[in-house]
């Protein structure tokens, strides 16, 4: 955003973000008041330091990373159908992704209008069903 912050996406780590910014991980931890043991959550907002790398270069590196993750996935799997499911008590989007063996980034793509920070019991999700690509 204009304030120099981003929303953490699936599969991103503090190490990735630091690399893309040419910063030490500790610098990002300090900027965001994160302890050494803190884990990033998808959807979490983080302040970034663009003093060494411009926003455009950062975004190019970030997009290339995500494209690579998706390309590798689709070389192995393809979506055969989708199913609409409603979360029950004790369910979460993460558990659903685990149960159906789909990455969170793919589940988020199929439910792009949902705020995943607010997903809970009663939320309806479209779940892609994947199958291994034939050799």
Feature locations, PLM:
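Extracytoplasmic low-complexity/disordered linkers and repeat tracts associated with LysM-containing
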Residues: 1-135
């Amino acid at each position: 955003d204009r304030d120099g912050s981003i929303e953490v996406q699936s599969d991103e780590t503090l190490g990735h973000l630091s690399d893309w910014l040419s910063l030490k991980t500790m610098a990002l931890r300090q900027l965001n008041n994160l302890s050494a043991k803190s884990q990033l959550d998808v959807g979490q907002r983080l302040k970034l330091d663009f003093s060494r790398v411009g926003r455009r270069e950062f975004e190019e590196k970030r997009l290339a990373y995500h494209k690579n993750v998706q390309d590798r996935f689709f070389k192995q799997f393809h979506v055969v159908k989708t199913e609409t499911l409603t979360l029950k008590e004790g369910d979460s989007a993460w558990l659903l992704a685990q149960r159906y063996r789909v990455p969170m980034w793919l589940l988020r793509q199929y439910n792009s209008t949902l705020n995943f920070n607010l997903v809970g019991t009663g939320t309806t999700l479209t779940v892609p069903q994947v199958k291994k690509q034939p050799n």
